[in-house]
Amino acid sequence: MNESEIPIDIHTLKLQDWLISRRIVPKNVQQELREIHRKISNALQDMPSNEQLIKLLARTNINYYHVKEIIEILKQTEKDTKSVFGTYGSQRMKDWQEISRLYEKNATYLAETAQIFVRNVNYEIPGVRKQMARLEQQADETQKRAHDLNKPESQILADHSALLEQLGVKGDNLHAEFVQVLSGLPELYDKSLVGIANIQPGIDLYAEVSGNKQVLPILNHLVEFGNTTVYQYIHKEAPLAVEEPPIRLNLSEGNASKDDNAVAEIDFGTDDNGGTSSTVSAEIIDYGDFGSGDLPESDGGNIDWGIESAPTDAVEINFDIPVEEYGIVVEGTGMDGGTAKGDQAYTLLDSPNYRDRFLDEIYELESFLRMRIYELKQLESSSDIMFSLMDNIATHDGESIWKILVSVEKIIQQTSDKQTQHLFQLKHSPKYANMLATKLQQMTKAVEKLRATREALKQLTIELREQRQDLNPVLEELIAQTRTLQSHIEKDISKRYKNRVVNLMGGVN
């Protein structure tokens, strides 16, 4: 094989050292390059107006091959200054020809071309590719983050809708809607006690087993009389009038409408017996003054009553007649003459104190019934008959007790459901309305913030992908430039070694 047929393989990382070791370029080539770049900067200050030049000079880095192109363009623009000897009188042409000679001296152009080629292969192209990959990754992550925000938004919207549903409001005007739903609270109480008569056998069984006939007094009262006022439960008689404390919804200005900032005083329109209240307190009725001292003495005037009176003897009037026998409630007895006020005006399920006692009793009854069912199951599975558990089995077997327990659990569920709890707190806690309104407002703001964030992330994703696309022509131009430089280097070295094939290893892909 001839020497000319043996290829020359040069690794890109060792290209510059190879050129110096073969004494193709000097070691101090950097000083010559700095001088050349200084002259290029000065020459660029005086350039003719030409579209080709403008396009060429738009490149950031001017190398030897650009200088050769500039000279070819100047041959056209400066042809008027050309002498018969082939020289140019134009200073522009002289400057660029001098730059070209400096490049060709000591093969400085080859050293610079090798530097640019190595820099592009090792840094510029990988850097652009990494930037593109990073932008693509950021776009994917941003898109995923925007998609992940759908889940918390849906959860908050579901919680918001659930809370509004529990409260029975739409959320448009909370103050007015709170007032409206609170008016239906007595109906909720009545609905929760529809089947309370079914637990009477359980109460009787508990009283018989415990030996205490006065056990569970509130449940007994509810079964017999229903959800009456606390006044009736305490005094064993219905009040003449009910003056329930006004309800105060302390909603802040941001949570209430302009016309609803006043204190809400709600009249539920029901008395303790479930009917429409039409009683009026005796304190506000003016009966007039009919004392005997103010009546004029008369013999009855000229009024003929149509009654024939017979002469009678003087009769002594007995004022000690028991008015109770005639169903008369005397003013001054009971509480302000039979008017339920304050906490006693609330119903048993509506009173904070008595509601807790009711829940204690209903849970106590539930525990007793569960224990009773457990004991009956143990009795059935045990070979030794426990005589202490034989009482009432004939009338209350496991199935009958289970039916009572189902009724008890239904009452517990209905009296302790979310809507009843919210409305109860809303009525008796002045700050609860504002707390609910604030919570709803925070949910709404959270959803708005999530939506704004998602839109911002979507916009950022679009921008990142656009930046990624903008780098495509940059990368293509770098690759094209690098391949051109590689071709120049291989051809130049090949000429120096009898046109042997030169391969730059590790070049651009």
Swiss-Prot record:
Instruction: List where in the cell it is found.
Output: Nucleus; Cytoplasm
Q: Indicate where this protein is primarily found.
A: nucleus
One cellular component GO annotation, for this chain's record? nucleus
Task: Tell me the superkingdom of the source.
Answer: Eukaryota
What InterPro entries does this protein map onto?
Answer: CDK5RAP3
> What processes in GO biological process is this protein linked to?
regulation of cyclin-dependent protein serine/threonine kinase activity; regulation of mitotic cell cycle
Q: Which UniProt keywords apply?
A: Cytoplasm, Nucleus, Ubl conjugation pathway
Q: Which family does it belong to?
A: Belongs to the CDK5RAP3 family.
Q: What does this protein do?
A: Substrate adapter of E3 ligase complexes mediating ufmylation, the covalent attachment of the ubiquitin-like modifier UFM1 to substrate proteins, and which is involved in various processes, such as ribosome recycling and reticulophagy (also called ER-phagy).
The protein, known as: CDK5RAP3 protein homolog
